Amino acid sequence: MRIVKLTAESKKGLLEDLLQRSPNHYGQYESAVAEIIEMVKKGGDEALFSYTEKFDHCKMDAAHIRVTREEIDEAYQKVDADFVEVMKKSAANIRAFHEKQLRNSWFDPKPDGTILGMKILPIAIAGVYVPGGKAAYPSSVLMNVLPAKVAGVERIIMTTPPGADGKVNPGTLVAAHIAGVDEIYKVGGAQAIAAMAFGTQSIPKVDKITGPGNIFVALAKKACFGYVSIDSIAGPSEILVIADETANPRYVAADLLSQAEHDELASAILITTSKTLADQVSIEVDRFVANLSRREIIEKSLNNYGYILLVDSLDEAADTANEIASEHLEILTKDPFAMMTKIRNAGAIFLGEYSSEPLGDYFAGPNHVLPTNGTARFFSPLNVDDFLKKTSIISYSRPALEKIHQDIECFAENEGLTAHANSIRVRFEKED
C-alpha cells in the first residue's frame, strides 16, 4: 500500500479522489435507467418480464414471479444447517439491538385544554432489494428486513434477481424466511426498483425501498425518490482505521482487506502516527493478499483507493477522519474510547482490537447499512425510525385559543395571508 505523509495538499487530493466513487458521478447511466423506469411505469408486468429476460436471461411470467413456500423449503435443504443456526443467532442480535430504538406516540395535555403530541406509526408496506448472483448476501436481508419488522411494518416484500434457471439464491431465501419477509419476487435491477416504486400487476407499490445494489439499482433509487422513500444512494464500501504504535499490524492489515475485497472501488485507509506501524502494515497486507480468494479485486481496490496516511498527532487523525466521514471507522489506539469522543462523522465506530469490522457486518446487532461517500456527515445507519412515520397532533379548547388568537392573527396579517387570519378571527365573532 502507498504510504503518504498527510499535508493540506495531499488531503485535498485524497478527498477529491474518494468522492469520485459517488453514484452522483455515474451520469452516463442515468438515461438508460430513466428509460427502464418509464417503461415499467407504463408497461407494468410486461416490461418487467421483458427486462428480466434481457438482463437475467430468464423467462418470467405472472405465475412464477413470486417465490412459493415449496421453493423456500427447497432452499433450506440446500443451505448448511450450521449456517442456518448462525443466521438465526445473528437475527436475534439484530432484532434485540433495534428493539431499543422503538419510540411510542406521545401526548402532552395542558391544564387549559391544549393537547399537543406526536402520533408514531409504521409505514404500511416496505420493499427490500437484495442483489443476486455473486453479490447475494443473506446478511443484507437480515439487516434490511428486521428493522422494518421491529417497527411493525405489516407487509414487507422483497425483490431479488433470478438465475437463468428461474431460481433464487437459497441463502437469500432462507434469510428472508428467518427475518419474516411476507412476499418474495424474482426480479432484479432498476426494473425491480421501478416496480416497487410505482407498482405493477404482480408487485405492489411500496412506501419505502431499502437495500444495496449495483450502479443501476442506486440510480433507480435516486430517480424514484419522491415517489417513494428510500434508505440512501449507497456508494462502494469503505473502511478507515485510526491506529497508533500500540496496534497489531496484522490486525490492521486484515481489517483493511476485509473491505478492499468488496469491489475495485472500495476504499481502505489507515491513518497512523507511527511510521513503524505503517511499514509493518504494508508488509502484512502483501502477505495476506497473496493467499486471498479475491486477490485480483483487492489489488485493484488498493491501487485505486488504498492509502496509509502518516499524521503528526491523533488529533490530526481525528480531524482527517471527520473530513472523510467513512462508512466504517476502526479505532486501534491505546485508549480507543477517549479517541471516540473526538469523532463526529462515521457510519459505525469499532473500538479496540477485538472489534473487527466484520463483527458489525454479520453479528453484533447494529445495522450494517451505513452512509458512504462522506454522507456520514448528515446521514445515519438504517434503523427502526426509517420505517416509522410521524404525525403532529394539535388540539386547542376555546379558552386556550382565545388567549392567543390575536397573536396568530397578527402573524398571518404580517405575512399577507388574510384568509389565515380570518380562519382564527371567525371563531371569536360576536354573535348578533
Predicted regions: what is each one?
Residues M1-A124:
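N-terminal Rossmann-like NAD(P)+-binding subdomain of aldehyde/semialdehyde dehydrogenases
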Residues I3-E9, E183-G188, I308-S313:
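Short acidic-hydrophobic, aromatic-tinged amphipathic segments that line or gate anion-handling sites
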Residues D108-V174:
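Conserved small-residue-rich beta-alpha loop and adjacent elements
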Residues E154-G163, A268-S274, V281, G352:
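Short internal beta-strands
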Residues G180-S258, H262-S267:
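Conserved NAD(P)+-binding/catalytic subdomain of aldehyde/semialdehyde dehydrogenases
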Residues H262, L270-A346:
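A glycine- and small/hydrophobic-rich beta-loop-beta segment
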Residues N322-D432:
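C-terminal core of ALDH-fold dehydrogenases
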